[in-house]
Each structure stands twice: as structure tokens, then as C-alpha cells.
Amino acid sequence: MKQAKKQGVLERFYYSSDEIIEKPFNWAQMWRLLSYVKPYRKTILPLSFLTVLIGTAVKLVIPILIGVYVLDQAITGRNSELLIQLIFIISGLYVLNYAANVLRIRWMNQLGQHVIYDLRQHLFTHVQRLSHRFFDQRSAGSILVRIMNDINSLQELFTSGVINLLTDLLLLAGVIIILFTLSPELTIAIMVTLPIMFFISTSLRKKIRRSWQTVRLKQSKLNSHLNESIQGIRVTQAFTQEEENMAYFDGVNQENYESWREATRKNAMFRPLVEMTNAIGTAVLIWYGATLIMNETITIGVFVSFAFYLGMFWEPISRLGQVYNQLLMGMASSERIFEFLDEQPNVKEKPNAIHNEKINGEISFEEVEFSYDEKRKALHAVSFSIPAGSTLALVGHTGSGKTTIANLISRFYDAAGGTIKIDGIPIKDLSLASLRSQISIVLQDTFIFSGTIMENIRFGRPNASDEEVMKASQAVGADEFISDLAEGYATEVEERGSVLSAGQRQLISFARALLADPAIIILDEATASIDTETEVKIQQALKTLLKGRTAVMIAHRLSTIRDADRIIVLDHGRKIEEGNHDQLLAKGGIYAGLVKAQYSTAIE
């Protein structure tokens, strides 16, 4: 098999621990999956079961009518009246069976669609509530695979697999009872083939299950690569890495193809082996059945009925193999789905959390420590306070802990040590909704959703009027370029706002944040993507709009934080300097050096 060529950033497409799930098949997990059928136990489910019972009963009756009554009584006894009656009865039963099958398929499809809808809704809702650490450890592609592909793979299991399993088990039980009733000796003779069937099933079961697990893993890897390749197409083309990317994709695609081929090859082995076992059973039936007829132990009609039932015996067994494969595929997917559903948020809200309708915005950090992993601390006993309505700027090299502080204020992560307070209340005591609803964040990498510009600005406050949206846009200088667009605020923008410039996207994010009317605004290098002319426009707007609000500014351009009430310089997670712009310049420390370096670069 061709292996995916790994190089550069593509090496990140590995099988992380959350992708490798090796749990044995167990009924507890199946019952958990079937719990999603529970809401329909009084509606669609009983109707489906009724059609199963009717269809199974009809199938079991027809061979007896044909063999014992048509052959042994009507034809052998030359009773034409009985023959005509039996023909009408059998024809009516076939029509009834057809109607039962149509209704069963219809209702089971409805049930399957309901269950898939509920399961996908449950999974998506759960993922929405997980903490940022969960998303740090997984690619967007692998998450999409769980929500889309893995749940889709359960659709056939719910629409046909489970009901077919029930149908086949009922049919098998009925056939075995009737076979022993017709001829215990002949039944026992035929049953000698069952050990062969058992051996085939047990030997293939584990191999087939592992094959479908591999298929799911390869699909996840393929989807992850596709997702990132599409999102990063501009970077790929800018660095002329198309050939390398295509070569890597060819390897990943080949691995996916090989995994499917191996799984289907093992699946394909099952049915022919069942048919071979069926042939052996048929040979036993003909040989021993003929002997019993000649000895007048059974009649020809019983023999014919027996032949019908033998076919009905092996047919569900053959299908059980197929249903079992569906179960294996479903288990492989459900394990991955439940692995997500069992994931608990790292950031949890207390049962009696305080819900503050309005906060003033005073923020304090008291000996706060934090680390993203065990290897390196991101913050070392950081302490500071921000009076309500004032502006704090965070400065430092990449990895100094600036964004970490912003994330902790919004409680996207919980501090490993120390206490963070807002208005004197530990943020762990506040409800997440009341905390985050009063904080607006503007990031350097602005995310624009598919929809209109109006809808994007209104995202954080859905009930805002059009006038309020326009007022917020005017305040940050976004109204000027929006009004120049053909459709204005009704202009449709694609995912991530690709038709807009970086500066325009940033202005929309400013308007979005300000429309929410927060007590606290966090600007995470929010002006880094804005040109100098646009920056001048928004600086004046920010002075007005930040008045009366607490602001935390993470600065890349130090010129944007001159007017900050206080500046903290961070280095490797430690607070090194603190003061306003003039004080830090006079100190001649790290901040003064950064300002001098940026000024020199600007002159050059």
C-alpha cells in the first residue's frame, strides 16, 4: 500500500489517541445507542414491530400451506375445490406480506431519520459546550467526521439493521420450531452444519471489526487533510506547494481506498461461506429426506415444506452476517461518537453559579498560574488589577502569555493556581453565560460567517435593530465601506469573508463587538491586520467607545497603546514591567527597547 508522504506541517495528520478506540463489542454500548429510539417507543416503533410480526407469521405459514395442504391434501387427494381455496389464501398472504414489508420499510426509514437527527443534534450541542482545550487537541476535520460521517454510517443500522436483526431472529426461531415439529430426525441431521457456521462467524468476526475501525480512522485522516488543504489553499499556492500537497493527498487517499478494499474483501468472504454451508445442508436434506420418504416416515409434502423452511433457515443466517457487519460498522462509529459525548468540559459551571445581569468590569489577577501542558508554564504567579472603565495593554514577545490572560478572563480555560476576580467575585463563581455575555473579543484572525454583513455584525446580539447595527458600524468606521457595496448591509459574504479585505473584516468584528455593549472589551492584536489609514480612523472611534468600559489590549503595534492607562510587559509568562507609556519609556527597560526597535523599523 502506498504510504502518505509526510513532510512539513503535513506530519500533523497522525492518529491521535482519541482516534484509536479499541473496545470489544458489547451490548451495553448497543443499548446506549438504542436509547435514542426510546422517544418513539409509543409511535413509530410499535407499528414497525407489528409489521415485522405480520410479515414473519405470513412467511412461516405459506410453506406449510404449499407442502402439507396443497401437495398432500389438495393435489394428492384430487380436491380441486380445496386447491382453489388454498390458491386464494396463499395469494392473499403474499399480498399481506407485501403490504407489511412496504409499511415496515417506510416506518423504519422514518424512525432512522428521526434517530439520526436526534443523535447529530445531541452531538453538535454537546460539542458546542466543550472547552477550548478539547478543540486544541483535535483538527476541525476529525470533528466533522464524527458529526457527519460517523453518524451517517449509523443510518443504515437504524433504518434496516436493527429491524432486520429482529425479523431474522424471529424467523429463525419459528423455522426451527416448525422443522422439529415436521421431522425431528431430519432437523437434527441438517443441524450438523451449524458448527461449521459457528466456526466461520467467530473466525471472521474480529477481523471484520478491526477492518471497519481502520476504515473510520483512514476516513478521519482524509477528511482532516481535505479540510485543512481547502482552508489553507492560499498559503499552499503562495509557497508553490501544490505538487507536495497533491502527493500527500494521493497517499492519504490511497490508504483510505486500501482500507475500504480490505474491509469489503473480508465482508465478501462471509456470504459465499454461508452458501457453501447451505449447499451441504441441502445435500443432507436430499439424501436423508429421500430415505425418509422411501421409508414412508414423511410425505412428499412434508419434504417440500422442509425444503422451503431450509431455505428460510439459511437466508436469515446469511443476512445475519450482513447485519452483523452493519453492527460492527455501527459499533466502530458509535464508539467514536460516544467518545465525544463522554468528553466533559474542562471549564465547568457551579450548580449555584451567580448570574450577574450587569458587571462594572473591575478585573484582578492574584498569583495566577496556568499551563497548556505539563512541559511548560504559560503564566507564573501573575498578579495585577484593572479598575473598571480603564484600559490595560499587554505587551511581550510571542509566547509571553498575553493571549493566555485574555483566554483566562473569558474563562475559556481555568487557571491552574491563583484567583481571577471580576468586581471582586471569583469568575468560577459566575455563570458562564453572564460572564461571557458581558465580554466582547476582537481577534486578529477575524471569523466571518456565511450570511449578510448585517447578520454578522448582529451575531453577538441577535435582537439588535438595524439602526443599532448601523450606529455601531459608523462608530468604528465600518459604515463607509459597507455603504459603498452594491447591497450595503444586505451584502452576502461567504465563509470567512473571503470577498472582504483583512481590514474590512476587522472593522466588521469591531462593530460586532461594540454592538454587544459589553462591560469588558478584549482586543487581541486586533489592529495588526489593519492598514495605517484605517488604523487612524478606528483609534478615534475606540477612544469614544471604550470610555466607561474596561479594555484589555494585546498589542502588536505599540503605537496603538500609547493612551492605555497601564501597560504590562510579559516575558515567558512573567510580569516584567508595569506602568504607563511615558513611565516605561523613562525606565529604559524591555518596553522602551521594543518601542525603539519598532520605531527604527518604521523609519527604515
From Swiss-Prot:
Its main location: membrane. ATP binds at residues 396-403. GO terms for molecular function: ABC-type transporter activity; ATP binding; ATP hydrolysis activity; ATPase-coupled lipid transmembrane transporter activity. The keyword ATP-binding applies. It comes from the Bacteria. Pfam families: ABC_membrane, ABC_tran. Residues 363-597 form the ABC transporter domain. Keywords: ATP-binding, Cell membrane, Membrane, Nucleotide-binding, Transmembrane, Transmembrane helix, Transport. SMART domains: AAA. GO terms for biological process: transmembrane transport. It is a multi-pass membrane protein. One of its GO terms (cellular component) is plasma membrane. Residues 45-329 form the ABC transmembrane type-1 domain. The chain crosses the membrane at residues 49-69, 82-102, 162-182, 184-204, 273-293, 297-317. It is found in: Cell membrane. The keyword Nuclease does not apply. Disulfide bonds: none annotated. Belongs to the ABC transporter superfamily. PANTHER family: ATP-BINDING CASSETTE SUB-FAMILY B MEMBER 10, MITOCHONDRIAL, ATP-DEPENDENT PERMEASE MDL1, MITOCHONDRIAL. This is Uncharacterized ABC transporter ATP-binding protein YknV. It comes from Bacillus subtilis (strain 168).
